[in-house]
């Protein structure tokens, strides 16, 4: 679960789509981890009378990818097909939806446990889940674990989910009541999240219900009334993103990228690359969902971006030419630039978000470059 590669796998999986007045893009990267354990769901237009609803989620697996993969394929069905969600005839009420989401999580968790026991020994993998269910009137934020979702409204972070960590007082109380302990901020000194799907080794305390176990599958659900004028975008991401970027930082960075491109896949790729260069060592997945009032491409912002790239290119060339013998390594170039007051760097991303631009110029000007040299070795992180 904690093993790392000698160099990161930087290939990305992308997707994008639109409908119901929404646009979305997503990006995921294995990064430094030995295995890719993340998964995701993106569905615009749900079946059975919910054509104007949409669902998006990120799943961050651990100790294997089985639970994350199963949830990405089946969690939505467990949510929308249970009686608590449907309630009476017609569109489900807010309380129906919230109860149905909770029931769906508990049902799929129990279903996976039964399936696992029927096989050769229980599956030991688990997964966080963070998602949004978007109706024409409401956005329902869903969280179980330490992945995170946030809503940017009127250029500010309006809402974000709370991470479920063992050190949280309420989580710690439940863990201790189930006979467990919190050591080095982990459940029984091992698991770093206090709520998750799967992780059945932590859900076998006799006399305790499913939401009273060492690790609970119960999600927190928050309903937020939509604001057509002010809602701009939603970000869903695993902790590989949040480990190196704060809520406001990521919100500011995404907003700045939306002012220079309307390609949401590209924006998500920039988020993932920037987090890698900021030092993230985990799998990374991010979904960006834009409302009609999301920032639009600005000619002024595009011009400033081009000027910044040109400035960085000239500075890299100057640094290389200044070297008396040979060519300085890329780490030296990055550290030199990091020590300077460079205007107009993307907020939140800063110099790390321009690593690809800098590296491209460096490689073009470096006659000694080895094409097999990894572009993000551990020594490069400054």
Swiss-Prot record:
Q: Where does Mn(2+) 2 bind?
A: 60, 239, 282
So which domain of life are we looking at? Answer: Eukaryota
Q: Which residues form the PPM-type phosphatase domain?
A: 23-291
Q: What class of enzyme is it?
A: hydrolase
Which EC number(s) does UniProt give? 3.1.3.16
Write down any Gene Ontology CC term: cytosol
GO BP field: cellular response to transforming growth factor beta stimulus; N-terminal protein myristoylation; negative regulation of BMP signaling pathway; negative regulation of canonical NF-kappaB signal transduction; negative regulation of non-canonical NF-kappaB signal transduction; negative regulation of transforming growth factor beta receptor signaling pathway; positive regulation of canonical Wnt signaling pathway; positive regulation of DNA-templated transcription
MF (Gene Ontology): calmodulin-dependent protein phosphatase activity; magnesium ion binding; manganese ion binding; phosphoprotein phosphatase activity; R-SMAD binding
Q: In its keyword annotation, does this UniProt entry include Isomerase?
A: no
How does the entry describe its membrane topology?
Lipid-anchor
Give all Phosphoserine modified positions: 375, 377
Sites of N-myristoyl glycine lipid linkage?
A: 2
Name its cellular compartments. Answer: Nucleus; Cytoplasm, Cytosol; Membrane
Cofactor detail note: Binds 2 magnesium or manganese ions per subunit.
Q: Which residues bind Mn(2+) 1?
A: 60-61
Tell me which Pfam families the record gives: PP2C (PF00481), PP2C_C (PF07830)
Q: Give the required cofactors.
A: Mg(2+); Mn(2+)
Q: Which reaction does it catalyse?
A: O-phospho-L-seryl-[protein] + H2O = L-seryl-[protein] + phosphate; O-phospho-L-threonyl-[protein] + H2O = L-threonyl-[protein] + phosphate
What this chain does, per the entry, is described as:
Enzyme with a broad specificity. Negatively regulates TGF-beta signaling through dephosphorylating SMAD2 and SMAD3, resulting in their dissociation from SMAD4, nuclear export of the SMADs and termination of the TGF-beta-mediated signaling. Dephosphorylates PRKAA1 and PRKAA2. Plays an important role in the termination of TNF-alpha-mediated NF-kappa-B activation through dephosphorylating and inactivating IKBKB/IKKB.
Q: Which family does it belong to?
A: Belongs to the PP2C family.
Per its record, how is this protein called by name?
A: Protein phosphatase 1A
């Amino acid at each position: 679960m904690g093993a790392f590669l000698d160099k990161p796998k930087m290939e990305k999986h992308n997707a994008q789509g639109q409908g119901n007045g929404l646009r979305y893009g997503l990006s995921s990267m294995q990064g430094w981890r030995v295995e890719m354990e993340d998964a995701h769901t993106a569905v615009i237009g749900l079946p059975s009378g919910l054509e104007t609803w949409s669902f998006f989620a990120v799943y961050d697996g651990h100790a294997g990818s089985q639970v994350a993969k199963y949830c990405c394929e089946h969690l939505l069905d467990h949510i929308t097909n249970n009686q608590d969600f449907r309630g009476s005839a017609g569109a489900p009420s807010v309380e129906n939806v919230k109860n149905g989401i909770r029931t769906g999580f508990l049902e799929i968790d129990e279903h996976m446990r039964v399936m696992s026991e029927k096989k050769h020994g229980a599956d030991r993998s688990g997964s966080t889940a963070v998602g949004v269910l978007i109706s024409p009137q409401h956005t329902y934020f869903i969280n179980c674990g330490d992945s995170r979702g946030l809503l940017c409204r009127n250029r500010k972070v309006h809402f974000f989910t709370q991470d479920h960590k063992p050190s949280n007082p309420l989580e710690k109380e439940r863990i201790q009541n189930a006979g467990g302990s919190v050591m080095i901020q982990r459940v029984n000194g091992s698991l770093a999240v206090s709520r998750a799907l799967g992780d059945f080794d932590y859900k076998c305390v006799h006399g305790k219900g499913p939401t009273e176990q060492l690790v609970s599958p119960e999600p927190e659900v928050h309903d937020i009334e939509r604001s057509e004028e002010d809602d701009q975008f939603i970000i869903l991401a695993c902790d590989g993103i949040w480990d190196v970027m704060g809520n406001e930082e990521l919100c500011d960075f995404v907003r700045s990228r939306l002012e220079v491109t309307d390609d949401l896949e590209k924006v998500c790729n920039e988020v993932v690359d920037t987090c890698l260069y900021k030092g993230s060592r985990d799998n990374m997945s991010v979904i960006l969902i834009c409302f009609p009032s999301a920032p639009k491409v600005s000619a002024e912002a595009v011009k400033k971006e081009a000027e910044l790239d040109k400035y960085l290119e000239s500075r890299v060339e100057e640094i290389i030419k200044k070297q008396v013998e040979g060519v300085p390594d890329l780490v030296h170039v990055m550290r030199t630039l990091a020590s300077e007051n460079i205007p107009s760097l993307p907020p939140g991303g800063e110099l790390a978000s321009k690593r690809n631009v800098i590296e491209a110029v460096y490689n073009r000007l470096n006659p000694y470059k080895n094409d097999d040299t990894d572009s993000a070795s551990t020594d490069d992180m400054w």
